[in-house]
Each structure stands twice: as C-alpha cells, then as structure tokens.
Amino acid sequence: MKTHVKALVVGGGAVGTGIAYHLAKAGWDTMLLERDELTSGSTWHAAGLLPLFNMGYATTHIHKYSVDFYKSLEAETGLNAGFYVVGNLRMAQTDARMDEYMLYSSVAETADVYHEFMTPKQIRDRWPLVRTDDLKGAIFHPQDGYINPADVTQAMAKGARQHGVTIERKWQVDGYKWTGSEWIVSITKMVERGGNLLPSDETAEIHAEHVVTATGNHAQRTARLLGIKIPAIPVEHQYIVTEPDPMLQEYRKNHPEHPVLRDADAKWYVREERGGWILGPYERNAPARFLYDVPESFRADLFPLDLERIETEYLSMIHRLPSSETTGLKDDFNGPICYTPDGNPLVGPAPGLRNMWLAEGFSFGITAAGGTGYYLAQMMVEGEAEMDMASLDPKRYGTWMTTEYAARKNEECYAHVFILHHPDEEREACRPLRTSPAYDRQKARGAQFGQINGWDRPNYYGPVDAPAEFDHNSRSFRRGSWWKYAVEEAKAIRETAGLIDATAFTKHIVRGPGATAFLDWFTCNALPKVGRINLTYALTPTGTTRTEYTIVRNGENEYYLVSAGAWTAYDADYLRKCAEDKAPEFGYIEIHDVTTQWGVFAIAGPNSRKILAELIRDANPETALSNKRFPWLSARKIELGMCPVNAIRVAYTGELGWELHHPIEMQNYLFDQLIAAGDKHGMKLVGGRAQNWLRQEKSYRAFGTELGRDATPLEAALDRFVDLSKDFQGKQAMLDKGIRSLCCTLLIDGPADADPWGKEALLLDGVKIGRLTSGGYSVAFNKQIGMGYVRPDLAKVGTKLKVRMFRELYDVVVVEDGPFDPTNARIRVDG
C-alpha cells in the first residue's frame, strides 16, 4: 500500500469516488480509503434520483454537471452507470407552487438548464395514469431521471483508477496529525467477525499533503477526530416499493417509462420500479440519527419501517396514481440520509485547519457527487472554483453551533424538502437562539424576525398585535403582506429617520506591530488615517472578492474591522490563516473576535443628527455632530446619555447616518434613549428588507450577492476602492482576469404585484447576457430595482435589456451607479 500521496480521500461512497476521480484527472496523486466496501454507506440504499431542480445558483451548477458527467462515464470507463433518462415531472396543485416553479425557471435559465412547463391536459394526454383534475400545471426536465447508485459509483471508481487513483478498502481512519506541511493519517485494517466489521491489529500511516473527508453518516466521528464541529447528522428517510401494477404494465407495452413524478404539495416522489412504483415521502417527524457516532454494528443496515408516519403520503400517491391502489407492498427501506441545517452540503476548507477539506452532509449525494468532485478539485488544484462556492462553505456555521441545534434543524430541513420555498421563507426550529439584548423590546413593537448565522434580527416591523402565524402567512413569491410595512420603513429613512439593529455584524480587532503592514497587503484599498474609516476588500489569491470590510483605524497599529454578520466564522478563518502566514514577514499580529461584545444600532435619515443631538453629552453639543467635528467616513468616541459609543459616520442606506457601536450590556438603555428621542422626529424602527432595497438605490454591493469568489472587485465596478499603486494579495491575478462581466444597477418596469428577488435572467434580443444578483422595490423611483452582472459592453448607462419574471419579459434599463443621490449630497449634509 502506498504511504505518501498528494491527496487522500476518506470515504468510498458516490461523493468520495467523484472527488477522487476529478483530483486524479487534474493530475494529483490520489488515494481513496473506505472503511468497508464502496457504496456501503447511504449510497447503497439511495433511490438514485437526479433532480436538476434547485433554487441555489451554485447547487444548480453542481447538479447540472453531474447529470452531464454521468452520461459520459460509460464511454470513458466501459461501465454502464445505470442512468435512466426518463425526465422529471414536478406537479403543482396551487398557484403558489406554480409561482415557485416560475422563479426556479429563472434560476435554471441563468445556468442553462433546459426545462418545459406543462398544462394538466398535456400531462394527462402524455401519461394517462396520472390524475390531473386538481393540478395547476407542472415543470418538466426531460434531461434528468434516475441512476443506479452502485453502478455510477463503480463507474467513477473505475475512471478514478484509470487516472491513477489507488483505492484501499476495509481501512478505518483513527487519527489525523498535521505536521505543518502534511497530514499523517493513522489507519487500522478492518476485518469481518460474526457479521460485524471490527478493527484488527494491523495499522499503518498515510502521509498526505491534502485530505478530503467524504464520510457520510460517519461525519460526527470525523468531527471528533479533527476537533471541529460538522453539522452533518443523518435523518431517517423511508421509501417503499410496490408490487407490480397491472395497469402500469399494460401501459408500458406501448409507451416509454414514466418520468420521475414529484407531487411537491403532497410531499413525495414516485418512480417506476420493475412494473411497480417506488414512493419516497418527506414526511414530518422523521428523527435524526447518529448524533454522536454510528454504532460499530451498523453497516449496510436499515431502520424499521414506520408506515404510520407516511400514511398521508401513501394515500396521496393513490389519489395521484389511482391504479396503484390495488398493488401490495413489495419492499421497504428506511435508512440514514445526511442533512445539514440549511440543506446544502458542506464543501470546502475545514475551519481552522490547513489542507483539510470537507465534503459532508449530502442529502442529495448521488445528484451532487460528480459536480462536487469537479468544483472541489478546482478549489484544491487551482485555488478557487469557477463559481462562488461560499453557500456550501463549511464555515457558514460558527462555533456557537451545537449538536442539538444541528439535529433539530436537520429534522426540520428534511420535513421542508417539499414545502413552498419562498424567497422570504424563515424557518422556526431552534429560535430564538442568538439574540441582541433589545430582542424583546423589538418584538413588543411588532418586529418579525429572520435568522442569520443563528442571530434573530428584524426583517420588518408588522402590527404590534400580530398573531404568531402572521409572518408565515405573509410570505409570497410576489409581494407578500409584509411588503407594505417595508415600504413605510424605507420611506421613513428617506424622509425622517430609521433605526436598524445591526448587532449581528462580524467585528474583529486587529492590532500589533505587524498589523498595519499585514492589512495593507491583505486588503486592496489604502488604509485609513487614525480616526478615519474606509471600505475595502480582502481578495483570494486568485483575485476574486473574499470579504468586504469597513475598517476603522483606532491607532497606528490597531484596527476595528466590521464585516457581514452572516459570515463570522468564514471571515475569521481566512483572516487568521492569512495573518499566521504573513506574521514572519510583517511582525506580530493579534486578532480578537469581538462580535458578541459590541452591539450596533444604525440610525439614518434626514433627522438622524437631530435625534442624536438630544442625547449627546459634549462641551459643545451643537457642533459635536457637524461636518467639521464629525466628518463623513470618520469615527469618534461619543457619549449618548450614560452610554459610551464608538460612532462611525457611515450609512448603508445612503442617508445621513451613523453606526453606533456600543457595549452590548448597555443596549437596552441606549435603545430606550433612542426611541424616546426618535419619537419626536418621526423615527421608525426598520428591518433588513427595507434596508436591502435602500442599499440598491445607492448601488451598494452586498457579500453573497454582488460580491463573491467568482468576481473581482474590478468586475464588481468597485475601482474606486482598489488602490493599484500598492501591492496586495491577489492583485496580479485580478488584473490578469480582466473584465469578464460587469456589475451594474438596473431599474425595472416589472409586474404590478411582484419584485425581482435577484435570481432572474437578463436578456437582450432573447439571448441571456447576464443575471440579477439582487432585486427589490425602490421607494425613490416607485418601481422595481435590481443589481446584477452583464456583458461588459452592456453595462453602459441607458442600455435597454429585458428581465424574465413569471415567464414574462419586462423592460430594464441600466442606470448610473448610485442612482439615488449620485453626488452623495444627502450623506454629507452639514448641520
């Protein structure tokens, strides 16, 4: 057995073999270890469905690659991958479900995923066994279907071997040790004894520069060995196989196989299986399993079937396929399928570790295996994937995440597979968990909360006496009933003042003798002078945008960094690793995460100075907030009543405003003072949805939408924040990329009852030329607004395009950056 490799992949399911294949194809010396046999985990009992349907941009690309890749495997390896291209039909019982499919259609169009819409009559004419009288329609993917999980895994394994991969079975990993340049992986030979797989006395060590874990149901053991948290915990998934259906058998004499049928409103999928049907429900109350480890006795095993739990779904299958009523039950499966709290797998660098890569938590592992291997190999070999993989990054979960949280959220995620996935969806499990001190005060004033990175923060403020189900019932693919409240909040910031809770912001202190030199290299903008702030970006080594920072310079070698609240662990990990790498060159650097030490209120609007003037304690309170003493883009320590505040004159809404960073234990006092003063000046409490609209009126980019690892700051049209006179990480790579596409702001004459969500395709003469990354409503222009990426030649002011919403085309025009108050007069106003 080899003992030294470039990359070691741990786990021989579909995901692990897909990764090994693509690493070897990219030229890396790769070994794959499997503790049992290939496919012996969840792969063996997977139903093998290959749904192209997914609302996520990155995941859609992963699924699309897999489907195309699997079709090519036989030609390369000589092994039939068992791919049945029967298509996939997603039916809709409600208008809301059809709205969901139309929004998905926009995502699919941006990724070039072919699909069709069908009427109930078209469905019935083509597949007469399907009852359609209560359907509104369907969306059909003719190019996907299902695959034999064992066959496709073996085909990928053969392809991997052809590219030089060594596959070793019956070896269990027992330890990982990082030497500073490689991993030493301790392994033990597993042997069969009495039907169980047990460790033997034979051990070995593998030296690997890189390690990828794709350990499926064993992710908690992997987490323990690595000393990290991995929120990948399996949930029971049942499916049943019926006896042959005589009417189906008769139909098949003259017709091809049915597509995979999905009745999302009934929470199930069905496909043909040897003259009968497979029913796979996603029912409520499916329990999480293996919260801490998989028992040694559990191999290719299953759990007892719980028919009572899926009775509703079974009866609804009979309703949709009446011929199935007389068929008996032939077989059943109830096995563990891994989930994560948000349903996306964990793909990318492990938190806090070097050259350790995770590929865990796949609930649709067969669908994702090929694409994950392709894009993860790009990340490992080239430094970044060709698209932004941040939505799958393991560090989207921080150290606050516990096993109990992951288990409960994973159960919820399983039960939500087929619910309506509104863009304004907020799930209720494990909430509230992380809250700012003012949570109860905000709730008493009508706050309806959303959860980001475990934090509950206001999305908008509804009626004070709203029932518990108000927010859930407000959701829509069009303008939900929350929309009017967000409009009033946005108007308040433009006309009077608004107060936003931004406590969830990520906050770091960077200081020490090497801090200035490090941050000058780490970010692309010039560093601010003491007492001033700037907006800047940390780049990846490949020149794309990794993190957006507001930097406050507290002293010659002390800086306060503020970044997006959703990405605390993601930002901290990169910041620390880069600082560790550069400390020998630049000198000692301290990094402190102070996120939970400081609360933040953002006050903005024409009356914001008047409100703060009532509270400020200063020898000359009339001038304390003037442009002379407190200019735009500066920071000062002030006192608001009895609360010390680190105030920053900046506003994400494009109005006169300040961020008020305060000791978190004084938040309720400060909140009460601001409310009392603000009530005299028309101030409203404002949530994140109104803020999102307002920042688009100013063309302020947001991380995760306009900003990410698939575009450079220059492509994001942020040239003014890039100092090309200095050296910084990723500079040359950024310049070498050129301008492949360009970010711009667009005003949209859209439908009367809907706004774009930032998922829609942009077209010129019927040809896709870009996509929206953000969307919403503009109170300033009284129409829809959006931001997105287009071909560089089309990013000019006045360019007319089209956007597709609800299968209709609407007029779009490219406008100047910051179309509202383009000279920033309102932000700079004196007083």
Where in this protein do the model-derived segments appear?
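Beta1/beta-strand and adjacent pyrophosphate-binding region of the FAD-binding site
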Residues: 2-15, 31
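Flavin-dependent oxidoreductases
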Residues: 18, 176-303, 312-315, 320, ...
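Flavin (FAD/FMN) cofactor-binding and adjacent substrate-gating region
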Residues: 72, 93-169, 174-189, 193, ...
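C-terminal catalytic lobe of FAD-dependent flavoproteins
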Residues: 149, 265, 274, 296-433
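Glycine-rich FAD pyrophosphate-binding loop
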Residues: 24-44
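Glycine/proline-enriched, intrinsically flexible loops and inter-domain linkers
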Residues: 387-388, 393-831
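Dinucleotide-binding Rossmann-like beta1-alpha1 core, especially the glycine-rich loop
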Residues: 48-126, 265-270, 275-278, 411-425, ...
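Central beta-strand plus flanking loop segment that forms part of the substrate or channel wall
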Residues: 47-52, 88-90, 227-253, 312, ...
